[in-house]
UniProtKB/Swiss-Prot annotation:
Keywords in alphabetical order: Cytoplasm, Hydrolase
Species, as recorded: Verminephrobacter eiseniae (strain EF01-2)
Pfam families linked to this entry: Urease_gamma
Subcellular location(s) per record: Cytoplasm
Protein name as it appears in the record: Urease subunit gamma
Pathway info: Nitrogen metabolism; urea degradation; CO(2) and NH(3) from urea (urease route): step 1/1
Originating gene: ureA
Amino acid sequence: MELTPREKDKLLIFTAALLAERRKARGLKLNHPEAVALISAAIMEGARDGKTVAELMSAGRTLLSRADVMEGIAEMIPDIQVEATFPDGSKLVTVHQPIV
């Protein structure tokens, strides 16, 4: 199976997000890479589902709270930018202050 670098990146994000979901479900606080992966994967999947950029920007702020992440992680992530594939092409989605 031949994958492009972008496809490899998407799979890596998805794998990290899956791990983050499992850890969160067990009650563990997420670290920086896990939090970013979880939010990024949700944005990418939402784009594939046909949601708008505005919907994803809003939804991206509801996925994690400060209680879900290790101390100081919320301050380390002022925004997250994801290039997501929508039905009408790729678009950049920016979520400001994703962890409230």
